[in-house]
Amino acid sequence: MNYFLKAPILGFEHISGVRLEKIDSLFSRLMGQTNSPMALDMVLVNPYCLREYSFVIPKYIELLLELDSHSKVEVYCVVVLQKNLEDSMVNFLAPLVFNSKNGFGAQVALSMMDYPDFGFRDPLKSFVIKERERA
């Protein structure tokens, strides 16, 4: 699905349109819709599949995305891929929030002070191992 970014992705402020493609129930791919030399192409993860994950969407983001009780909100976190997938890092402090009802999206920068259990480079393997131990 295509989205218009109402608040930019950090480091990609020049990109306002993105395409979100689901790879599977865990991973998705986000691509910028621009011919800029600084193209956006990143892997995202559904944080709720990895851990307990809850945060308050700031009021200004609610307003920008026109969120209401009927909105279909999707939340993803950026994955910094490594050669070995399990060594990849997840940024839980800067989630991407999408309102699929109207096609708006934004990145939210969370404070470590407010969310001390969230990291910006948590190794994916720490969550994969926990999942294997449950099986």
Swiss-Prot record:
Compartments in which it is found: Cytoplasm
Entry keyword set: Bacterial flagellum biogenesis, Chaperone, Cytoplasm, Translation regulation
A Gene Ontology biological process term: bacterial-type flagellum assembly
Listed InterPro entries: Flagellar_assembly_factor_FliW (IPR003775), Flagellar_assmbl_FliW_dom_sf (IPR024046)
One cellular component term from this protein's GO annotations in UniProt: cytoplasm
Main location: cytoplasm
Entry similarity comment: Belongs to the FliW family.
Subunit structure: Interacts with translational regulator CsrA and flagellin(s).
Functional description taken from the UniProt entry: Acts as an anti-CsrA protein, binds CsrA and prevents it from repressing translation of its target genes, one of which is flagellin. Binds to flagellin and participates in the assembly of the flagellum.
Record-given protein name: Flagellar assembly factor FliW 2
Species classification: Bacteria, Pseudomonadati, Campylobacterota, Epsilonproteobacteria, Campylobacterales
